Structure formats: C-alpha cells, structure tokens
Amino acid sequence: PAGLNFSLCGMPHWNSDIGGFFAGHYNKSWNDDSASKNPLYQELYVRWLQFGTFNPMMRSHGTDVYREIYKFGKKGEPVYDAIEKMIGLRYSLLPYIYSTSWEVSNRQSSFMRALMMDFVDDRKVWDINDEYMFGKSILVAPIAHAQYTPEAVVKVSEEEGWSRDGAKKTKTDAAVDFMETKSTNIYLPAGTLWYDFWTNEKHEGGKEITKETTLDVIPLYVKAGSIIPVGPQVQYATEKPWSHLELKVYAGENGNFILYEDEFDNYNYEKGAYTEIPISWNNASRKLTIGARKGAYEGMLKNRKFTVTLQDGTQKSVDYNGKAISVKF
C-alpha cells in the first residue's frame, strides 16, 4: 500500500530496498553469509524482487545479507532461476518502462497506479491495496505472504506494530520444495478483458480468479487493447540498441502506446532531443498502425524492425524507417 499511497499523493518515483535493508536476523550468526541459503529469506527475497521488478526503480539494497544472484545457488536451481527470470524480465521491459517514465515526466502520469485510478466505476477495486497497474497495461498482484515457509514477521496491530519476537522465527533447518505449486486469489477489474501475462489465457473482468503459481511466478495480467514493446536481453540498459523490438498486442479492444526514445544518458531531452512513435491497434479491423516518428536526437535509429505478436502467437515483422506503416492480421 505504501507505494500506491505515494503515487496517489503525486510522488511517483517510489521504491523499496529489495530484501530489506537490515536482514541480519536471517543469518545463523552475525555476518556469516548464511541467509542467502535460508529458505525463509530465499522466499522473502524472491517475492520481494518480483514486486520490485514492477516498481519505478528496481533496487536490491541492504546490509548483513549478500544479494548477488550467485549467493542464492546456481543456474538450474529454483531460487537462482526465479531471480534470473525477474532480472531478465525487467531488462526486456525497458522500452515499456522508459516510455512510461516519459508519460510520468511529461504527461503527469504514474508508474504504480491504484486500481481505482483506471477502473473508478468498479467499486470492488476501491479498497484493493495489494494489486495495482504498472503503467496503464499490466496488472500486478504480488505475492506478499509466505507460501513455502512460515511467516517470519507478524504484524500484531496498527498500534503495537511488528512482533518483537519475530527474530526467533527467521531461521529453519526444514527442507523446502520450491518446485511445489501453490495458488493465490486475484480480482480482475470489470469493464475489460484480461490476459495472463505468462500463459495468454483470457479472463473476463469483474471476477475473482485463482492463479496457480510456483516460486518463479508473480501473477501478472494484461489489459485488452494493450501494446507492450519488448526489448532484447541485455546485461545493462544500453548494451544493445533497440533496433529490433517486439510489439506484444493484446486484442479485444482498441489501444494505443507511444514509444519514447532519447540519448538515454543526459538531459538533452529537456531541450527537445527525443522521439515519439505513436502505435495504435484497431480491434475491429485487426490492424496495427505504427505512426510517423516525431522529433529527433543525435544518434537515433533511422531504421529498425518491429515484430508484432498477438496474444494468440500470430506474428508479423515489418521494417520501419520513420514513416507510418500498418500491419493487418
């Protein structure tokens, strides 16, 4: 709820210290580097990282516990793979996130949007504080309570705060099967169709559904009519140019998106050095239009490829040179 409260108060650039700043109680003894092998902390860290992936800033930060991915295991193990999956997803969504950041800066939008901001006519969402929209397309329903291990910290009440004996509950020698399937309930706002981000399964809005999850899955749903640009897998933000982007289109309603780009590492955008590419989906004609590029900046891509992917897996690729072009499905 804190992030949503900040956004509602006009402060969109909110984040948290993923994994908790002070997390030493999860070590067997002070600074012994054991917390990253402690199942209670592993589950907490993965779920927190998943939530942080859909924060304005994604930052793993703290003391007492080493947060490097290799501290949690190795490739092929569930905890390591879950962490790697989220890091990769954050990077691949940079075109969507960066464009959303421009909406925040230039059009007074917000990253984390309480559901009532976009679905005010659905009274059921007015009091929902554990789901939110990330940008205007992706509904995020973080798993905030332990599913595989005991809850380590218990909130007694608003007056008394957190349980003082919580530290006693932060250690366990019990084996945990992080491959086991769990489930959680999610409410999807009324008035639109929703697609499961991971499976593309379609759902009617205005209903509570049960989502089966494993440790590596955070429930995500995409609103019908959404256009989500996806970039390449990279090790750092500017490692590769956006010369070939995938445009994920979720049919069912009309939709639009503005792809924003600039020099990425300075304030020249304040002087007008940036571009916008308007993209729209007409659901009746099943046509995607990539509009004429507006603006310019030094070193911008003059030509690129877009691969358009519908939620049913249908794909078409087009070459784009800055002039309007349409793709019909």
Task: Enumerate the predicted regions with their spans.
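Catalytic-domain carbohydrate-binding cleft regions of carbohydrate-active enzymes
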Residues: 1-216, 222-223
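Accessory, solvent-exposed terminal regions and/or long lumenal/extracellular loops of proteins
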Residues: 215-324
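Solvent-exposed, conformationally flexible loop/turn segments
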Residues: 179-181, 206-207, 320-329
